[in-house]
Structures are given as C-alpha cells and as structure tokens.
C-alpha cells in the first residue's frame, strides 16, 4: 500500500530515505485508533496543509511526511535553479554592458587620435604651402628686380647709343666702333637675361622638387604615425578586453 502511494509521484524516493528523516519516538501502536494509510489517501496527498497539521503524533508523521518532503524538495530545487539562472543572466547582462562600454571607449579614442592626426597633417600641409608661396613670391620679387635693373641698363645703353650716334654721325669709324661695342653690350645683356631666366626656371624646379620631397616625407611620416597609432590602439583595446574578461570571469567564479 505504501508503494501505491509512492507511484503517484514521477520520481519516488526509497521508503528507507523517508523513514530515516522521521524523528525517533514511539513505535507504531495498534491502539492508536487511527485507520490504516490505505483508508486515508486524501490525508497522505493533502499538500495544502500547514506544517502545524503535520506535527501530530509520531505515527502520523511517519505515515504522512514522506510525500510532503518530496514535494517541498522539488519546490526548493526549482527555486534554486531559478535563482542561479537569474544570477547568470545578471552576470551576462553586466558582461555585455562592460563590453559595450569598452567598445564605446575604443571608438572615442580612435576618433580622438584620428582627429588629432588629421589636424597635425593639415597644419603641416598648410605650413608647407605657405612656405612654398613665400619662396615663390621671394623669387618673383628678386628676379623681377633683376629684370628691371637689366631693362633699365639696356634702356640707358640704347639712350647712350642714340646720343653717341647723333654726335658721331660724321665719324664713321667711331660710329662703327660704337656700334660694335653696342652690339657686344647687347649680346652681353641678352646673355645675362638668358642666364637669369635659366636660373629662375631652375630655382622654380628646385622649389617644386623640394616641395614634392616634403610632401612625400610628410606622407610617409603620416603613414608611420597612423600605423603606430593603430598598433597602440589595438594593444590598448586587447589589454582592456582581457581585463574586462578576467574581471567578469572572476566575478562569475568568486
């Protein structure tokens, strides 16, 4: 009959286990006046009674407490599982929040480093452009002044030639000599202008070449700085992520 009562549960426990949990006292007496357990099925499976109703005679405790213990044990196990699941869910949510914070901090650092790099690059390019414009303006002013000086000297030479031609119109030899001298002077002036022009072109080419070298060097430095910056950010990010993972694992384990 006791086995029939135990079959009502999906996972019945051995009768010896229930009997071990019953407190020691008087043995079951036939004079107790209580009917057998088979005549009281409702009392054996009445799980809604309080613990006070289960604290009767020792014989009632031995007959009625076994199924009640099974039910309460299952309820406590389900509650413990729910508590553990809630704690795991809270730890996972906290872990996800830490990862999101780390990713946001990483993104802010990358944006800050990128803005700083672009700002420094723009400043360098503006400085190079300003230097180039100043050098070109300086060369223009310098060679313009030299051209003006040569032109003024040329005009003075022509004026002298005309004056001397008028004065020495009657003296052919002297006029021829002066003409030859004037041609020589003009050739020298033309040669000087040609040299100045060639120097001007060469100076412009040198300036452009230097600027190209400066741009190339600046670009190489920028690439190196960006590579170093990327490596630094990746190392910091890995360290931060490892620290977060270690912290989360410690909080989960301890």
From Swiss-Prot:
Positions of post-translational Phosphoserine modification:
8, 10-11, 55, 57, 77
Q: In terms of one coarse class, where is the protein primarily found?
A: nucleus
Q: How does it assemble?
A: Component of the lateral elements of synaptonemal complexes. Homotetramer; the tetrameric helix bundles assemble end to end into long homopolimeric fibers that exhibit a transversal striation with a periodicity of about 20 nm (in vitro). Interacts with SYCP2. Forms a complex with EWSR1, PRDM9, REC8 and SYCP1; complex formation is dependent of phosphorylated form of REC8 and requires PRDM9 bound to hotspot DNA; EWSR1 joins PRDM9 with the chromosomal axis through REC8.
Protein purpose: Component of the synaptonemal complexes (SCS), formed between homologous chromosomes during meiotic prophase. Required for centromere pairing during meiosis in male germ cells. Required for normal meiosis during spermatogenesis and male fertility. Plays a lesser role in female fertility. Required for efficient phosphorylation of HORMAD1 and HORMAD2.
Tissue expression remark: Detected in oocytes. Detected in spermatocytes and testis (at protein level).
Q: Could you tell me which species this protein originates from?
A: Mus musculus (Mouse)
The family line of this record is: Belongs to the XLR/SYCP3 family.
Q: What happens when the gene is disrupted?
A: Homozygous males with null mutations have smaller testes and are sterile, due to massive apoptotic cell death of male germ cells during meiotic prophase. Spermatocytes fail to form axial/lateral elements and synaptonemal complexes, and the chromosomes in the mutant spermatocytes do not synapse. In contrast, females are fertile and generate healthy offspring. However, they exhibit a sharp reduction in litter size that increases with advancing maternal age. In contrast to wild-type, a high percentage of the mutant embryos display aneuploidy.
Task: State whether keyword DNA-binding applies.
Answer: yes
Gene giving rise to this polypeptide:
Sycp3
* Residue ranges of the region described as Important for oligomerization and fiber formation: 87-92, 249-254
Q: Where in the cell is it found?
A: Nucleus; Chromosome; Chromosome, Centromere
Record flagged with keyword Kinase: no
By what name is this protein known? Answer: Synaptonemal complex protein 3
Q: How is it modified after translation?
A: Phosphorylated.
Residue segments, region Interaction with DNA: 71-76, 106-109
Q: Where is this motif: Nuclear localization signal?
A: 106-109
Where do Basic residues bias regions lie? 17-31
Q: Which UniProt keywords apply?
A: Cell cycle, Cell division, Centromere, Chromosome, Coiled coil, DNA-binding, Meiosis, Nucleus, Phosphoprotein
**Gene Ontology CC terms, in alphabetical order:** chromosome; chromosome, centromeric region; condensed chromosome; condensed chromosome, centromeric region; condensed nuclear chromosome; female germ cell nucleus; lateral element; male germ cell nucleus
Comment text on domains: Composed of a long central coiled coil domain. The N-terminal and C-terminal regions interact with DNA.
Q: What residue spans carry the Basic and acidic residues bias annotation?
A: 40-55
Q: For this UniProt entry, which residues form the secretion signal?
A: none
Listed InterPro entries:
XLR/SYCP3, XLR/SYCP3/FAM9_dom
State the residue spans of region: Disordered. Answer: 1-65
């Amino acid at each position: 009959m006791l086995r029939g009562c135990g079959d009502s549960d999906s996972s019945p426990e051995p009768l010896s286990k229930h009997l071990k949990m019953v407190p020691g006292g008087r043995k079951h007496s036939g004079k107790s006046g209580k009917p057998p357990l088979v005549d009281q099925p409702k009392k054996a499976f009445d799980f809604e009674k309080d613990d006070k109703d289960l604290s009767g005679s020792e014989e009632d405790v031995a007959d009625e407490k076994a199924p009640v213990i099974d039910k309460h044990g299952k309820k406590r196990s389900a509650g413990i599982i729910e508590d553990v699941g809630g704690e795991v869910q809270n730890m996972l949510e906290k872990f996800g929040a830490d990862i999101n914070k780390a990713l946001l901090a990483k993104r802010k650092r990358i944006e800050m480093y990128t803005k700083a790099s672009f700002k420094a690059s723009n400043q360098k390019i503006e400085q190079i452009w300003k230097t180039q414009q100043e050098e070109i303006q300086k060369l223009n002013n310098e060679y313009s002044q030299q051209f003006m000086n040569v032109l003024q000297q040329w005009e003075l030479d022509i004026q002298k030639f005309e004056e001397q031609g008028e004065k020495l119109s009657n003296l052919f030899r002297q006029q021829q000599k002066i003409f030859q001298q004037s041609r020589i002077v003009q050739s020298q002036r033309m040669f000087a202008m040609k040299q100045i022009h060639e120097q001007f072109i060469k100076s412009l080419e040198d300036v452009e070449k230097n600027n190209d070298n400066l741009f190339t060097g600046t670009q190489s430095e920028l690439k190196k700085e960006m590579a170093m910056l990327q490596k630094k950010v990746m190392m910091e990010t890995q360290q931060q992520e490892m620290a977060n993972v270690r912290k989360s694992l410690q909080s989960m384990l301890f």
